[in-house]
């Protein structure tokens, strides 16, 4: 993929777009790993267990997707960048992948890409996470 980036930017963009789509579709089947404390408080008010909800379920409890955001803690863009840097680490990259629910207002505080330390990003944004037991 690195060679492709250097040789043909258009081809690289097509590959990156395809990988992004594949990873996001894969995520649709993955269990929710974390929920922010604030998202849990909001979900408790409407009697929803966010650990049981996937992106496809969101409109059932959040009409218009206005309150909650399904967050990729290890962003898809960062995953692809890491795959590009070290193609041998793809297995490790997928093992480190985490998704969870936060509030839209919390999402606005997060750096969208190039998160060097994903845990530190949440601490800096003052977003406390509850992990699946």
Predicted ranges, named:
Residues 93-96, 100-133:
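Catalytic cores of phosphodiester-bond-cleaving enzymes
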